[in-house]
């Protein structure tokens, strides 16, 4: 079971003050424990790709992060650059304001800019930022992500307050159906929480506490 959980974890370091030694430690831990990926800011993608080149651990990065307020063209450029640098997965933040305006065309175009730029070369996870949304908006965001060709929907950036909840994971799983991934991120700090998210329908866990989760400990980190 521990190995199965490890293969569902995106081992994460997204704080703005993260330093090189922390990224090196992140990659080493990911190799040792067999995590699905390391999730890092774009400036670290090349280093992670080099450190993980002979492993099964993927490099994941973030697009339009953490606000989602960049233009679709900027997000598309970020995506292409990340893939060129070695990323195999990208976690993009939607245009949250457009979603709340019910401007579905703009939201879908924003997501599709990234899925088109990824062009099958990287998995695309769509961060909907659940803490800022009503249930209706969460469902709509999930539906638009699926329509635009995303591979996953994801709860949170970890930068807007709140994080993953079992209730939201269930809602998102119901909204996307069985064939799209659901990533729980934000506040998953121990094995019990991770298992609860998985039982609710999560297929990936984003956490800086990956080592604590697989060891059955509790970490202090929020993301």
Swiss-Prot record:
Record has 4Fe-4S as a keyword: no
Gene3D superfamilies in the cross-refs: Aldolase class I
GN (gene name): deoC1
Enzyme Commission numbers on file: 4.1.2.4
Lineage: Bacteria, Bacillati, Bacillota, Bacilli, Bacillales
Function according to Swiss-Prot or TrEMBL: Catalyzes a reversible aldol reaction between acetaldehyde and D-glyceraldehyde 3-phosphate to generate 2-deoxy-D-ribose 5-phosphate.
Pathway membership, UniProt: Carbohydrate degradation; 2-deoxy-D-ribose 1-phosphate degradation; D-glyceraldehyde 3-phosphate and acetaldehyde from 2-deoxy-alpha-D-ribose 1-phosphate: step 2/2
Protein known as: Deoxyribose-phosphate aldolase 1
Cell location: Cytoplasm
Species for this entry: Bacillus licheniformis (strain ATCC 14580 / DSM 13 / JCM 2505 / CCUG 7422 / NBRC 12200 / NCIMB 9375 / NCTC 10341 / NRRL NRS-1264 / Gibson 46)
């Amino acid at each position: 079971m521990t190995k199965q959980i490890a293969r569902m974890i995106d081992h994460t370091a997204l704080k703005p003050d993260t330093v090189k030694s922390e990224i090196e430690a992140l990659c080493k831990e990911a190799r040792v424990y067999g995590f699905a990926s390391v999730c890092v800011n774009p400036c670290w993608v090349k280093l992670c790709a080099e450190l993980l080149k002979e492993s099964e651990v993927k490099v994941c990065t973030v697009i339009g992060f953490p606000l989602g307020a960049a233009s679709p063209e900027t997000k598309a450029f970020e995506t292409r650059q990340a893939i060129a640098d070695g990323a195999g997965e990208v976690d993009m933040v939607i245009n949250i304001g457009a979603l709340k305006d019910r401007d579905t065309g703009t939201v879908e175009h924003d997501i599709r800019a990234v899925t088109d730029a990824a062009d099958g070369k990287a998995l695309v996870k769509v961060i909907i930022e659940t803490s800022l949304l009503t249930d209706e908006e969460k469902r709509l965001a999930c539906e638009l992500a699926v329509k635009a060709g995303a591979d996953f929907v994801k709860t949170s950036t970890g930068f807007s307050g709140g994080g993953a909840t079992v209730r939201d994971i269930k809602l998102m799983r119901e909204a996307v159906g069985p064939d799209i991934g659901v990533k729980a991120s934000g506040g998953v700090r121990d094995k019990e929480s991770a298992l609860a998210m998985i039982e609710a329908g999560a297929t990936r866990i984003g956490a800086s506490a990956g080592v604590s989760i697989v060891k059955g400990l509790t970490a202090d980190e929020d993301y």
